[in-house]
Amino acid sequence: MSVSVAAEHDYIGLSEFPTMEATTMSDKTKTRDNNNGLNFKATELRLGLPGSESPERVDSRFLALNKSSCPVSGAKRVFSDAINDSNKWVFSPGSTTATGDVGSGSGPRTSVVKDGKSTTFTKPAVPVKEKKSSATAPASKAQVVGWPPIRSFRKNSMASSQSQKPGNNSETEEAEAKSGPEQPCLYVKVSMEGAPYLRKIDLKTYKSYLELSSALEKMFSCFTIGQFGSHGGCGRDGLNESRLTDLLRGSEYVVTYEDKDSDWMLVGDVPWEMFICSCKKLRIMKSSEAIGLAPRVMEKCRSRN
């Protein structure tokens, strides 16, 4: 009668020699993985310098790290291919093969191989559109309200408008040259003895002493003013001494003016253009008070001549 020896099983997972069994199991796992063609050691991520390879990584038949000598259809070119062969691109031979030359003036030439027959054709070069030599003027900006200040905006807009319209400026300058410089207004005050108010007139609007006298009469219609044209007419050259004296005696009021030297003179003693340039103020005074002005007027006219 044979006695069977009970086999001892480790149900908990513990053994007397855990280290040895773990080593044996790892060796068995590595052997099984190598037999199956899997190399997990080579695919582990490790720390190291850029470009360095782990000595434990071994190229297998399934993981080829070296560049294939024959290009595969649809594969991307690496950096060395782009440098060494910059003028051509090559696809793997198959049903259709295309090879093009880059940089030719007539466009890329393409060779197509289909069913053992080769056909080469050249694509027409795409014409390059020439840039317009005359650059279009920038559109004017919309008016800005607020900040920045409007004064600077107006200054810039005026400068741009002047630069955009050179023809109009030249036409304006020619018109101004023909018509002459625009003369400013020459306003002087007019006072009269006995009148409680003053008036102002523009001497540039009158062409002679007669027009000035008529205008002053309309301003002060309640007073009688000596007419410069009643004694033979007073033109643009003024009056002589006898006519000035007759004017003072035959009228109640006469027109005098203050010149640049602050002297009071009778109106009509000098030519009209000289009177306009030298007149600072007009005053209508009584003829009895202006009798002494006539001799002084003639003396001053003689000294000027």
From Swiss-Prot:
Recorded domain comment: The N-terminal half of the protein contains two conserved domains I and II. Domain I includes a slightly degenerated ERF-associated amphiphilic repression (EAR) motif which seems to be involved in the activity of transcriptional repression. Domain II is required for the correct degradation of the protein through the SCF-mediated ubiquitin-proteasome pathway. Interactions between Aux/IAA proteins and auxin response factors (ARFs) occur through their C-terminal dimerization domains III and IV.
GO biological processes: auxin-activated signaling pathway; response to auxin
Main localization, broad class: nucleus
Ranges of biased composition (kind: Polar residues): 155-170
Triggers of expression: By auxin.
Gene that encodes it: IAA27
Protein name: Auxin-responsive protein IAA27
Cellular component GO terms, alphabetical: nucleus
Keyword terms: Auxin signaling pathway, Nucleus, Repressor, Transcription, Transcription regulation
Subcellular location: Nucleus
Homology family: Belongs to the Aux/IAA family.
Region Disordered: start-end pairs: 96-119, 155-180
Short motif (EAR-like (transcriptional repression)): ranges: 45-49
Function per UniProt: Aux/IAA proteins are short-lived transcriptional factors that function as repressors of early auxin response genes at low auxin concentrations. Repression is thought to result from the interaction with auxin response factors (ARFs), proteins that bind to the auxin-responsive promoter element (AuxRE). Formation of heterodimers with ARF proteins may alter their ability to modulate early auxin response genes expression.
Keyword set includes RNA-binding: no
UniProt key word Transferase: no
Quaternary structure note: Homodimers and heterodimers. Interacts with phytochrome A. Interacts with TPL.
Classification via InterPro entries: AUX/IAA_dom, AUX_IAA, PB1-like
MF annotations from Gene Ontology: DNA-binding transcription factor activity; identical protein binding; transcription cis-regulatory region binding
Residue stretches making up the PB1 domain: 185-287
